[in-house]
């Protein structure tokens, strides 16, 4: 009887031991299975390598060596992305990004100054491109806490625009395309500058809006466009980029030409000269020029279109054959 009990005890002990081993195996297999299920959708996510660069505001940021998903929060930057052949990786844009037509198929994440941070994060971009440092404080820290780099462009003249094209080409792996585009753009700029270089500069008042009256200051890249087109902005020394300006001061400057950026995204807005300026030499001589706002106000590739249109308006005789 004692032997039977001992054998029974040993059998039970062995059975419990096998059961524990089996449970351990099952648990281990389960952990392996669930660990595999919890891996990121991108099997190379943990293999991504980064490098540090400086954006155009002087900030040091880390970007992947290969950037495949990105968002643009400025129409000009969206235009650059497509112009250098990088549109396939654009996963988000602002509601103002309307050119080229393909851009409108990309999901909008709000406007330039108040984008939806939640939507941006959900789209999983590696880099978000913004056009001015003034946008940074609102969302940079939150985006970077989700490992999203924020690259800032900062163009105060046409060379600054070209530099932005070059840098986006670097970040997006499209430098050869960017260089080819820049070669074409610089050639067109050269044609304009050669045509107007011997012409006396035209005094220009650039009316951003009439009520209230806003214009361009020394920090606006459009001030450089006016100069390259054979003009001189009468507000070139005013601090800032888009200063509010008194009608009396504008009239006292006696502009020979008034430029109204209208059409494009602005529609019919800003299509009338401010009341006080109707007594200016520009109006008296019929030198009021309406030019597509999207070409003039966006520091991207089409700024050269704006330069050509502006030069033809200020110096039509320089382009007649």
Language model region names:
Residues 4-26:
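Bacterial N-terminal signal peptides that target proteins for export
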Residues 54-58, 109-118, 134, 238-247:
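Short helix-initiation/N-cap motifs at beta->coil->alpha
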Residues 117-124, 146, 245-254:
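Short helices/loops that flank or line small-molecule/ion binding pockets
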Residues 53, 59-60, 126-127, 137-214, ...:
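Extracytoplasmic substrate-binding proteins
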Residues 33-36:
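C-terminal motif of bacterial Sec signal peptides marking the signal peptidase cleavage site
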């Amino acid at each position: 009887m004692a032997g039977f009990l001992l054998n029974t005890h040993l059998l039970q002990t062995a059975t419990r031991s096998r059961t524990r081993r089996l449970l351990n195996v099952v648990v281990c297999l389960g952990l392996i299975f669930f660990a595999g299920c919890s891996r990121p959708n991108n099997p190379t996510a943990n293999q991504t390598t980064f490098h540090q660069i400086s954006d155009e505001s002087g900030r040091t940021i880390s970007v992947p060596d290969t950037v495949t998903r990105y968002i643009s929060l400025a129409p000009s930057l969206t235009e650059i992305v497509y112009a250098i052949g990088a549109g396939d990786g654009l996963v988000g844009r602002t509601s103002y990004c309307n050119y080229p037509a393909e851009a409108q198929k990309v999901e909008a994440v709000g406007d330039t100054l108040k984008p939806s941070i939640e939507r941006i994060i959900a789209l999983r971009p590696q880099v978000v491109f913004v056009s001015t440092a003034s946008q940074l404080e609102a969302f940079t820290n939150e985006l970077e806490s989700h490992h999203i780099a924020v690259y800032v462009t900062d163009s105060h003249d046409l060379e600054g625009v070209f530099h932005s094209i070059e840098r986006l080409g670097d970040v997006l792996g499209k430098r050869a395309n960017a260089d080819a585009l820049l070669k074409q753009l610089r050639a067109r700029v050269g044609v304009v500058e050669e045509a107007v270089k011997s012409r006396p500069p035209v005094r220009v008042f650039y009316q951003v809006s009439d009520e209230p009256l806003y214009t361009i200051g020394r920090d606006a890249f459009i001030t450089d466009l006016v100069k390259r087109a054979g003009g001189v902005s009468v507000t070139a020394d005013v601090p800032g980029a888009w200063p509010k300006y008194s009608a009396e001061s504008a009239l006292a400057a006696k502009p020979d030409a008034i430029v109204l950026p209208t059409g494009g995204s602005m529609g019919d807005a800003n299509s009338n000269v401010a009341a006080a300026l109707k007594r200016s030499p520009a109006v008296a001589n019929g030198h009021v020029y309406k030019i597509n706002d999207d070409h003039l106000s966006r520091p991207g590739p089409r700024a050269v279109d704006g330069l050509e249109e502006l030069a033809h308006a200020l110096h039509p005789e320089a382009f007649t054959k």
